[in-house]
Amino acid sequence: MPKSFSELEKQNIRGILIGSCRLSWKNYGYKRTNIDELCQKAGISKGGFYIFFPSKERLFYETLLDVQQSLYTLMEDILAEEPGKSGLAKALKAVYAEYDKSPFLYDTASADFTGFINKLAPEEREAIGFDSLAGAKRLLAKSYLTLRIPEEMALSVLASLLNIAANKEKLLYDHFQVFDFMLDHTLDHIFG
């Protein structure tokens, strides 16, 4: 029978599992992330894992939501410090750097990511997309900029720019410089 944990221990262990999952997912992908190893890092048995998450997929789902929230917080902090176009550019460049460090964030077409997402319940898949869209809309509002084009087009253009990270190997030039150039030359057409 698994050990019982205090609420504080549960919070800490849950945080360790999510943090370890994030690192393992980044380094090895979904399929090669081993629950036994994550449990070992958290100091719990595999049976104890199920006190915190009903499945490997649920851990990954919670990890992905945590990653999304971290990105929103990063952008919100930058925009709070520097609202306007320059702050939005700085925030998007910071997000792009995170995308580059963690390919699982943007390589949604990979077999590894598809294998994970297909195991989620439909409402969980929908929540990931909804959270992403809602977060993007919230951040546009926090930039205090006026759109020159429809919001859906603006969001699509910015998402397309961030997807440069998924194709960086195909570029003939440094992908960070390409992203920066395209972003800097696009923002004036999106915002007034």
Question: What are the roles of these predicted feature ranges?
Answer:
Residues N12, I16-L23, N27, K41, ...:
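Alpha-helical structural segments
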Residues A141-T186:
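Hydrophobic/aromatic-rich alpha-helical bundle segments in the mid-to-C-terminal region
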Residues R14-R22, I117-L120, E124-E126:
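A short, Lys/Arg-enriched amphipathic alpha-helix from helix-turn-helix/homeodomain DNA-binding modules
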Residues Y72, N118-L155, Q177:
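Amphipathic alpha-helical packing segments from all-alpha helical-bundle domains
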Residues G87-K90, A94-E123, S156, A166-N167:
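Amphipathic alpha-helical segments used for helix-helix packing
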Residues T63, V67, L71, M75, ...:
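Hydrophobic recognition helices of helix-based DNA-binding modules
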Residues S24-R58:
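Helix-turn-helix
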